């Protein structure tokens, strides 16, 4: 009997599946999420509870061009109709905010800008897409302003970035996007500790407001975090918004 390696510290679903690590099958989460659909779902779980690996799994399932064999032998593969309808069908924007911190707001904003810029860079093919107009290609290039090796955003461009990227991906693929945001609350926690909480709340409220509330190109979004931040602080006006805690048995 083959003894599988334990994936200590590995949070990438594809790496675990390709490298033959032991994997506790959590793919029922995909089925549960789709069967209990909300436009925006926030999963709150304690630290070290597999949130990032779960989000990596969701990306691998929904993302256009995914290797469907990654799910061979797992629970979700038994639901053929669901896999046929949803697997590999969506552009996916995936950002993790677990590293967004700094002793000042400017430091944290620079880290945040790098994370957003790196994700946008993964879609560099949009700059040459024959589905986009010349103006739309210029808009995309405007999201990738780099000086001295750093992504440079003003606040307005930053807060509009995920919504604009969604629009351009929709134009290219003809399909609405899935947005996954991991550890959404870390920047707020770090900001509170270092005295710039209100500035960070304003920034994230603007980013989420455009990406999750007024985004006509959004199929659905899933967020994870340890804390349930007051809806009035950063989720103001979100419709069809669901918070799923560790106490919700339907997501066991």
Residue locations for each model-derived region?
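Phosphate-binding site recognition
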Residues: 1-252
């Amino acid at each position: 009997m083959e003894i599988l390696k334990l994936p200590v510290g590995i949070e990438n679903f594809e790496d675990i599946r390709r490298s033959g690590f032991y994997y506790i099958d959590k793919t029922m989460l995909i089925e549960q999420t789709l069967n209990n659909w909300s436009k925006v779902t926030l999963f709150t779980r304690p630290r070290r509870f597999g949130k990032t690996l779960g989000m990596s799994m969701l990306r691998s399932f929904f993302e256009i061009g995914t290797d469907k064999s990654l799910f061979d032998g797992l629970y979700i593969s038994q639901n053929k109709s669901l896999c046929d309808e949803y697997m590999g069908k969506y552009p996916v924007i995936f950002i993790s905010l677990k590293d967004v911190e700094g002793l000042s707001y400017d430091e944290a904003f620079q880290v945040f800008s790098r994370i957003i810029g790196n994700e946008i860079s993964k879609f560099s093919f949009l700059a040459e897409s024959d589905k986009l107009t010349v103006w739309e290609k210029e808009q995309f290039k405007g999201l990738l302003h780099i000086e001295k090796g750093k992504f440079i955003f003003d606040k307005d461009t930053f807060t509009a970035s995920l919504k604009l990227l969604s629009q351009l991906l929709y134009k290219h693929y003809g399909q609405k996007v899935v947005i996954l945001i991991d550890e959404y609350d870390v920047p707020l926690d770090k900001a509170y500790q270092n005295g710039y909480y209100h500035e960070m709340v304003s920034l994230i409220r603007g980013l989420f407001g455009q990406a999750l509330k007024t985004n006509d190109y959004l199929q659905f979004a899933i967020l994870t975090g340890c804390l349930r931040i007051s809806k009035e602080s950063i989720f103001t006006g979100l419709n069809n918004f669901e918070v799923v805690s560790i106490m919700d048995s339907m997501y066991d």
